[in-house]
Design a protein with these regions (language model features):
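Extracytoplasmic/secreted proteins, especially bacterial periplasmic and envelope-associated proteins
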Residues: 28-31, 36, 40-43, 47, ...
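Catalytic-core environment of secreted peptidases
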Residues: 35-53, 58-81, 107, 156-158, ...
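Metal-dependent peptidase/peptidase-like ectodomains
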Residues: 115-116, 155, 222-225, 230-241, ...
Length: 490
């Protein structure tokens, strides 16, 4: 009888203290959860969007300084250097420094001069050669020469010494196996090289967005022009730009020379640095479980932006916002009393805007084996909206449920998800390279924009961010990733 009483007493004590431990862990979780602050996360975004970093063009001294600032934050919080004692993973990254907006002058058929203005009418080319070119214009559609596909935009036109006007993309747009054949011709680099191969002296690239994902070619000057400029140039030549562009979808080239009395003159003031390097910033929270700590969860987002093109492109939403959210989550994990069983790798990619340089380098030179990578979560433009969208969430329900439960219990935001869909075109995000490597990959986005989205524009400033959704994004990362990290059933 005495033994039975003692057993029951010990059972009561054990269950009582188990309850206290559970409550303590809950308190610890809430303490960390509430420590994540919209004010601090906005401060991170404001710092990275500051003029002193000149838009964080990958490879530039200003980008490297922004990377060092992020690394210092990791160090201050106790996030470990992930690359053999270093917070940096370096890779080659040529870049072009743009010193001014340059100029863009149009001389009409009746000799009237129209001086187009930056940033209303054009952006200078991020990789333009320095100098001035002047000449007649030839429209070459997509600028593609693909004999095996029976398609050539340069057939029956002479562009030698002239300024070509061309479009991004390809005439084939369906996401199926046929698109694979067209994908090599979708790259901006290909289009530029093909223009030079055909003798073009310069380029008007239709679509006024900043774009470092091009190529620097000696003596080749180019600008990005607004569609309204293209419309004016076509109208003065007796054509309607919108109708010509629409006809491109018929899979037939529509190239033609504009009136030879129409002359454009474009100039750029730049310097190219072919041997520059950039870096990913890599920080680590080590897992504590002896069997699971060799497995890793990656949280990534690109640190680089569009740089300086006559004025600073702050690149606040794209992607200081995503980096700020990641920093908020990293600080929370570093200071949390609840530790993860699996390791967590925080990655701030360089070179995304230049062509996914940093993420490609990591996938080819991983710090953790690919087969030990449980999931990769990418953040890009996560700072303007009232809800969340998780790409690929429905395809990995055992992983995604940790984020769903966190949102339902603590955040109560509208959150939607999609199935993973094979992309037959060129990869467009850091996440796509991890996905192609066979890693379960999510992309976290904000939805229901509160402010206009100034994609690759100088107006992409911190005044168009919604700090409340950024705070909740960091909280969602903390809770969801902690759930994945401590799920022994995965």
């Amino acid at each position: 009888m005495l033994f039975k009483k003692n057993f029951l007493f010990l059972l009561f004590i054990a269950s009582h203290f188990a309850g206290l431990t559970q409550k303590t862990n809950s308190d610890k979780l809430l303490t960390t959860f509430h420590s994540i602050s919209s004010h601090e996360i906005l401060e991170f975004a404001e710092e990275l969007s500051a003029d002193k970093y000149k838009g964080r063009l990958s490879g530039s001294p200003e980008y490297l300084e922004a990377a060092r600032w992020c690394a210092r934050k990791f160090e201050d919080w106790g996030v470990l250097p992930a690359n053999n004692g270093s917070y940096f993973q370096n890779f080659p990254n040529a870049f072009t420094e743009v010193y001014s907006a340059g100029s863009f002058l149009y001389t009409t058929t009746d000799k009237k001069e129209i001086k187009y203005t930056f940033p209303e009418d054009y952006f200078p080319g991020s990789n333009s050669a320095s100098g001035t070119v002047s000449g007649e214009m030839v429209y070459v559609g997509y600028g593609i020469t693909a004999p095996e596909l029976g398609y050539d935009d340069y057939e029956n036109v002479n562009v030698e010494g002239k300024i070509v006007i061309l479009e991004s993309g390809t005439p084939y747009t369906k996401n199926d196996t046929t698109l694979v054949k067209w994908t090599p011709y979708a790259y901006h680099r290909y289009k530029f090289r093909n223009a030079v191969k055909h003798g073009a002296a310069g380029l008007l690239y239709v679509g006024k967005i900043a774009n470092p994902n091009t190529v620097h070619l000696e003596n080749f000057v180019y600008v990005h022009i607004d569609e309204k400029v293209a419309e004016q140039l076509f109208t003065d030549s007796g054509e309607k730009y919108s109708e010509v562009k629409k006809s491109l979808g018929e899979m037939k080239p529509v190239s033609f020379a504009l009136n030879p009395n129409q002359i454009v003159t474009i100039s750029a003031e730049t310097r190219h640095f072919p041997d520059a390097e950039s870096c990913n910033v890599v920080g680590l929270i080590e897992g504590y479980d002896p069997e699971l700590k060799d497995e890793v969860i990656i949280i990534g987002g690109h640190l680089d932006g569009q740089g300086f093109l006559g004025e600073v492109f702050p690149s606040a939403l794209d992607n200081a916002s995503g980096v700020a959210d990641i920093l908020g989550a990293a600080k929370a994990f570093a200071q949390s009393e609840i530790k993860p069983k699996r390791s967590i790798l925080f990655m701030l990619f360089g070179g995304e805007e230049c062509g996914l340089y940093g993420s490609r380098y990591y996938v080819e030179n991983p710090l953790f084996p690919i087969e030990k990578t449980v999931t990769m979560i990418n953040l890009d433009m996560v700072g303007n909206g009232t809800g969340f969208f998780v790409s690929n969430g429905k395809s990995y329900p055992k992983l995604f449920e940790h984020f769903e439960k966190a949102n339902e219990k603590f955040l109560h935001r509208e959150m939607a998800a999609s199935e993973q869909r094979k992309n037959y075109g060129r990869p467009r995000s850091d996440a796509s390279l991890f996905e192609n490597a066979g890693i379960p990959t999510f992309s976290l986005w904000t939805r229901n924009s509160v402010f206009p989205v100034y994609y690759h524009q100088p107006l992409d400033k911190t005044n168009v961010l919604t700090p409340e959704i950024m705070e909740d994004a960091a909280k969602l990362l903390y809770l969801g990733i902690l759930g994945v990290a401590n799920d022994s059933g995965l």
